[in-house]
């Protein structure tokens, strides 16, 4: 038993961690004493080393073999994806960055780190820790330090001026247009030094983008519409930029050019300065009546600055608006002042196709807006700051005179300064009640400016007809009773050919009991353009409407000289800002969806069919223009709730076509009953007894409804529809899609065509809700 206890004791002592060095035995001591003197230094060194506890380092752990696996656990599985990097400052070492990373992901998650080329390279144990570091960043010395991944680095893009309530998914489409997203978007803290305020975020966010080849840096801005307000977001890959000197690396507060030089030399006294006196000291000891404590006081006297000396650099900093006004004044006083553009009068006639032209010059004019201050603006700097309180670049009442008159009124900052005359459209001809130019009735607030209902831009703030502004929206002041003449005039010769746009001849007038005025449809618009005609529903039209409601004057054939039609016209002036063009595409969809009268005015219905639709009348006949190929008026249609034109739904058109006999007999319940239309219809389940619409007639109906020519592939697909036994279900589903798509732009109807093409190829119908709602 005793031997076993000693043996177990030895094993326990050997297996346990020694707290200190073991004492040498007597035999070992005698062995050291018997060694020669030449080895005594080595022996003493080894003995001293034996008495010192070795440092607990990774090398010592590996050399002694004391559990090295615990230190190297997870190192073998590391890849480049586990590494992150960040910039290092000269005041902090690598350990400070390791501690900062450990505070974010935990001390055990940090595996390796090093300083390379002025950057801290840190490897984390898991990819989750890497993503956390990239999204949150680290804080070193009270300053926020962004962290980038090593794998697929891309370029760090910083977004500024981003309100905290804007969600990230609203920014991703704009960022994807710049490059490939390599990381999620993260919010950048404000960097408060107070520990209780470190959670406060700034208006900046960061994201990793893989830019196109050959592009290292990007800088610009884009607009994000949100709840009726357009927010301008700035993005940049460079360092912080000074707005004073436009250089990188510092802000305006620390700009060298903005610092006041306090060590400037004192100028010599001026001969004309009577208050000059020699520099020296004034002693208070010789003065009477002065306290003894002040007798030894000496006041330093310096030469005062002459009145003709230059002010300090800080007083020389003038606003950009003042500088622009000075330049504008010089340009006005010089000989190189551009002449005002000529005004183009655009007529409308019933006998010919009206043509819209533009004033002389193709370039988009620059007009004074609520944010425009400079050579092209009549606003002073103080006025501009007040106008910037508006959420958009709309003209305010004081600025209407700058748009409609020959020049802008004198600005408050500079007497006599005027802006160049903008493009003004004068609607001439016989008038109702007055004969005054449009400018006399143009000084109206923006909320009273009419919309261009032709193009469906119903909700674009205050209006969308006429002039382009910095926001890309074109509008004219409301002309209360100004009328367009019903006589034929040619377009001015100076109008460029590429700017002339022919309006489809669906503008009709009739002497029916109920008012009838068909808005021109199918006008092809380029990106950013806004052109068309819009009827003005004015109470002065006594012959239209009920109880004094607005309408359009009914005109008989041959009465063009006495009666006029109220209408507004817009010029094809396009916006050149790519951001505006991109925003308009999405904004039109949103605004149409929010419009109250979207069901009748936003849908480009079938031009040939709708133009021939007339209200039921037993006492009068509708007078239509002489258009080749126009079908006979359809009977049996009731006037819809819209005041613009009747028969706005495709279902009513199909119903009228069935009653007229163009299609085979289809019951009204099968055609119009939406309750039986399912979200998904399987074409494979067919009813052979269902009547089939001829493919050629269906093709014409689709082409006329959409107002566009179908592709050849689509023609071929439609020709095969007669082989499908369930054509009627497809037509019913198509009607539902059209009804759902009333709020979309013209490009959305091309999506509907692709939608049907996909239905034919896969022999199934997609859900209506799956149709994209943004362009």
From Swiss-Prot:
Record key words, sorted: Transposable element
Keyword Transferase: no
Biased composition (Polar residues): 35-46
Feature: compositional bias, Basic and acidic residues: 1-10, 539-549
Superkingdom to which the source organism belongs: Eukaryota
Residue numbers spanned by region Disordered: 1-46, 256-277, 535-565
Record protein name field: Transposon TX1 uncharacterized 82 kDa protein
């Amino acid at each position: 038993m005793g031997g076993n206890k000693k043996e177990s004791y030895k094993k326990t002592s050997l297996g346990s961690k020694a707290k200190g060095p073991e004492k040498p035995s007597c035999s070992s001591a005698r062995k050291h004493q018997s060694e020669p003197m030449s080895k005594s230094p080595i022996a003493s060194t080894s003995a001293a080393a034996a008495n010192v506890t070795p440092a607990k380092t990774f090398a010592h752990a590996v050399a002694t073999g004391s559990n090295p696996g615990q230190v190297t656990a997870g190192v073998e599985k590391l890849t480049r994806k586990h590494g992150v990097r960040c910039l290092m400052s000269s005041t902090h070492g690598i350990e400070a960055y390791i501690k900062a990373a450990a505070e974010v992901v935990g001390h055990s998650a940090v595996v390796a780190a090093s300083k390379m080329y002025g950057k801290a390279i840190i490897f984390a144990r898991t990819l989750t820790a890497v993503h956390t570091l990239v999204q949150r960043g680290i804080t070193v010395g009270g300053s926020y330090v962004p962290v980038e991944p090593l794998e697929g680095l891309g370029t760090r893009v910083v977004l500024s001026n981003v309100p905290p309530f804007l969600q990230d998914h609203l920014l991703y489409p704009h960022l994807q247009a710049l490059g490939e997203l390599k990381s999620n978007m993260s919010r950048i803290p404000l960097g408060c030094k107070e520990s209780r305020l470190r959670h406060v975020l700034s208006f900046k966010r960061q994201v990793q983008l893989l830019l196109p080849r050959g592009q290292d840096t990007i800088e610009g801005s884009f607009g994000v519409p949100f709840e009726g307000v357009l927010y301008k977001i700035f993005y940049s890959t460079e360092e912080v930029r000074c707005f004073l000197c436009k250089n990188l690396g510092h802000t305006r507060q620390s700009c060298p050019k903005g610092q006041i030089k306090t060590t400037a030399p004192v100028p010599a006294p001026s001969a004309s300065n009577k208050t000059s006196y020699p520099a020296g000291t004034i002693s208070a000891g010789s003065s009477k009546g002065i306290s003894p404590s002040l007798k030894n006081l000496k006041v330093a006297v310096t030469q005062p600055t002459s009145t003709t000396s230059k002010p300090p650099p800080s007083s020389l900093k003038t606003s950009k608006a003042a500088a622009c006004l000075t330049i504008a004044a010089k340009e006005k006083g010089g000989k190189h002042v551009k002449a005002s553009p000529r005004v183009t009068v655009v007529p409308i006639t019933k006998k010919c196709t009206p043509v819209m032209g533009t004033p002389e010059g193709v370039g988009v004019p620059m007009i004074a807006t609520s944010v425009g201050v400079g050579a092209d603006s009549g606003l002073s700097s103080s006025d501009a700051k007040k106008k910037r309180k508006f959420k958009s670049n709309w003209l305010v009442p004081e600025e209407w005179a700058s748009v409609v008159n020959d020049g802008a009124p004198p600005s408050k900052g500079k007497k006599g300064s005027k802006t160049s005359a903008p493009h003004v459209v004068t609607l001439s001809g016989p008038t109702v009640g007055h004969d005054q130019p449009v400018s006399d009735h143009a000084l109206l607030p923006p909320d009273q400016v009419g919309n261009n209902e032709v193009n469906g831009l119903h909700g674009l703030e205050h209006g969308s007809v006429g002039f382009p502004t910095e926001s890309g929206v074109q509008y004219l002041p409301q002309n209360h009773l100004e009328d367009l003449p019903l006589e034929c005039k040619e377009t001015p010769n100076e109008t460029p050919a590429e700017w002339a746009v022919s309006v489809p001849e669906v503008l009709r007038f009739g002497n029916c009991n109920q008012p009838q005025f068909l808005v021109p449809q199918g006008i092809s618009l380029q990106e950013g353009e806004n052109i068309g005609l819009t009827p003005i529903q004015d109470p002065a039209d006594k012959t239209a409407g009920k109880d004094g409601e607005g309408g359009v004057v009914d005109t008989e054939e041959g009465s063009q000289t006495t009666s006029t039609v109220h209408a507004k016209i817009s010029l094809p002036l396009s916006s050149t800002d790519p951001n505006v063009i991109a925003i308009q595409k999405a904004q039109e969809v949103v605004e149409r969806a929010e419009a109250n009268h979207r069901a009748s005015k936003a849908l480009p219905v079938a031009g040939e069919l709708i133009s021939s639709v007339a209200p039921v009348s037993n006492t009068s006949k509708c007078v239509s223009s002489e258009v080749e190929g126009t079908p006979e008026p359809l009977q049996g249609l009731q006037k819809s709730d819209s005041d613009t034109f009747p028969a706005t739904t495709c279902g009513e058109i199909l119903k009228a076509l069935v009653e007229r006999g163009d299609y085979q007999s289809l019951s009204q319940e099968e055609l119009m009953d939406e309750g039986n239309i399912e979200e998904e219809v399987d074409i494979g389940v067919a009813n052979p007894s269902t009547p089939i619409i001829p493919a050629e007639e269906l093709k014409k109906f689709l082409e006329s409804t959409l107002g566009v020519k179908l592709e050849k592939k689509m023609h071929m697909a439609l020709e095969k529809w007669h082989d499908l036994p369930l054509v009627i279900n497809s037509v019913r589903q198509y009607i539902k899609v059209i009804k759902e798509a009333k709020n979309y732009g013209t490009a959305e109807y091309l999506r509907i065509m692709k939608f049907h093409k996909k239905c034919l190829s896969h022999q199934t119908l997609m859900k209506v809700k799956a149709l994209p709602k943004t362009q």
